[in-house]
A protein has these predicted regions:
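Short amphipathic alpha-helical segments at helix-loop
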Residues: 12, 59-63, 90, 171-174, ...
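Hydrophobic faces of well-ordered beta-strands that scaffold small-molecule active sites
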Residues: 3-8, 39-41, 89-91, 117-121, ...
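Active-site beta-loop-alpha junctions enriched in small/polar residues
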Residues: 8-13, 44-46, 94-96, 122-126, ...
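Histidine-acidic metal/acid-base catalytic patches
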Residues: 80, 102-118, 127-232
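N-terminal entry module detector
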Residues: 1-26, 232
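A short alpha-helix capping/helix-coil boundary motif
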Residues: 5-8, 56-59, 86, 167-171
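Active-site acidic/histidine proton-transfer and metal-coordination neighborhood
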Residues: 16-119
Length: 232
């Protein structure tokens, strides 16, 4: 049994960096002790992903230039701390945060050192946001050190936009599902990664109501799909 990683929330845009650093070191040391190779980080300053009644698309946060600078500088510092223990930070672009869209991902990648800040590639969050995942995958392939395989139920996403629902409401309504159960075509994703030097994890994610989608059945469905499509 091996650990893939564990989420870490940064607040580099809204709080003193010392607060994030103090918590990050504890998290880093735990993951190092567990044998992980990467640390998933996501900036939660101004994030609305955990707010039940705030419309996801209407109220998405947008960073100021000063906040972008704080984020980039802070991530460089965390990247160095991670490397002290032989780990890498992988940045998780995420719905309801200041790094969600293609433009925002590109800005973050442009502002950060590839040697210190890697990227987590999440199919579900990119498609949910309306982005083209293959564009991000191809452009930043050398910087991608962690992959989340997540599918989308487009009909639920359409309702989220129409009714101005929050991220949590979207999840509860089934916006996400396992690979092969939604609208995302994974064939080229697997092909590109197979033909690259990618050595990281494929993490299957599908946050949804277990009363509606039996976790064991959906885990088997995802496993079968990946085996058939990727040969893994």
């Amino acid at each position: 049994l091996e650990i893939a990683s564990a989420w870490f929330s940064t607040f580099l845009t809204t709080k003193p960096i010392e607060e994030t650093v103090e918590e990050f070191i504890k998290h880093r040391d735990f993951l190092h002790g567990m044998g992980a190779k990467v640390i998933v980080v996501s900036e939660q300053g101004h994030s609305i992903q955990g707010l039940m009644d705030v419309p996801l698309f209407k109220n998405k946060p947008v960073f100021t230039e000063e906040e972008w600078e704080k984020l980039a500088d802070g991530l460089h510092h965390l990247g160095k701390l991670a490397q002290e223990k032989g780990l890498h930070i992988v940045y998780h672009h995420h719905m309801g945060t200041g790094v969600q869209t293609t433009t925002e991902i590109e800005k973050l990648m442009d502002m950060t050192d590839p040697a210190l800040v890697s990227l987590l590639f999440d199919t579900g969050h990119l498609v949910f946001s309306g982005e083209e995942p293959l564009y991000i995958l191809k452009k930043y392939l050398p910087r991608i050190k962690h992959v989340h395989l997540k599918d989308i139920r487009q009909e639920v996403v359409d309702v989220v936009k129409e009714k101005e629902l929050s991220f949590l409401q979207a999840v509860k309504n089934g916006a996400f599902t396992v690979p092969g159960d939604g609208v995302i075509v994974f064939d080229e994703v697997f092909t590109i990664l197979a033909n690259s030097n990618y050595q990281g994890w494929f993490v299957v994610e599908a946050e949804q109501d277990p009363a509606l989608a039996n976790p064991f059945e959906y885990a088997l469905k995802a496993r079968k799909f990946i085996q058939e499509k990727a040969g893994l």
